[in-house]
Amino acid sequence: MTNANSPRHWTVRHFSQANPFGPGCDNVPALLRRLADSIEALGPVEIQNVVIESEMTEHGPWQSGTVYFHLPDDAATD
């Protein structure tokens, strides 16, 4: 029996991508398309979270994103 006060643990996979540095690095729609293409390339996955961040540069905010996800077989190994 599991103690109700015990924290649950699991493994989550992730990848990060950014727009190319320079003019256009602040283009959020381009970043979202890039992330969506990468998610589709993974095949069937369960998305846990998507985080968008920005870092100020001389070209404006440099956008990046991190996708946290699970593969279908991950539940069997946790």
Which residues does each predicted region cover?
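N-terminal acidic leader/helix
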Residues: 2-41
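Short, charge-rich amphipathic interface segments used for partner binding and complex assembly
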Residues: 34-78
